[in-house]
């Protein structure tokens, strides 16, 4: 009887450890995916900002070229 209790306890501990490992792996994978997604979103936002800056700079240059001829 005592041996059976040890086996049951050992199996429960093993299952708990396996569950913990699986949960940790899933969490790690999810966190990595979230991080990659966040970095991709930030890169896309930075790219849009650069494009806006580029357009604004082109508009400024265009106005600078037009201003002297208008005077």
Swiss-Prot record:
Tissues expressed in: Ubiquitous. Mostly abundant in brain and oocytes.
Superkingdom of the organism of origin: Eukaryota
GO molecular function: tubulin binding
Localisation: Cytoplasm, Cytoskeleton
SUPFAM superfamilies: Stathmin (SSF101494)
Main subcellular location of this protein, as a coarse class: cytoplasm
Keywords, alphabetical: Coiled coil, Cytoplasm, Cytoskeleton, Microtubule, Phosphoprotein
Presence of the UniProt keyword Phosphoprotein in the record: yes
GO cellular component, one term: microtubule
InterPro entries associated with the record: Stathmin_fam (IPR000956), Stathmin_sf (IPR036002)
Chain coiled-coil ranges: 1-67
GO BP term, example: microtubule depolymerization
Protein's job: Involved in the regulation of the microtubule (MT) filament system by destabilizing microtubules. It prevents assembly and promotes disassembly of microtubules.
Assigned protein family: Belongs to the stathmin family.
Protein name per Swiss-Prot or TrEMBL: Stathmin-1-B
UniProt organism field: Xenopus laevis
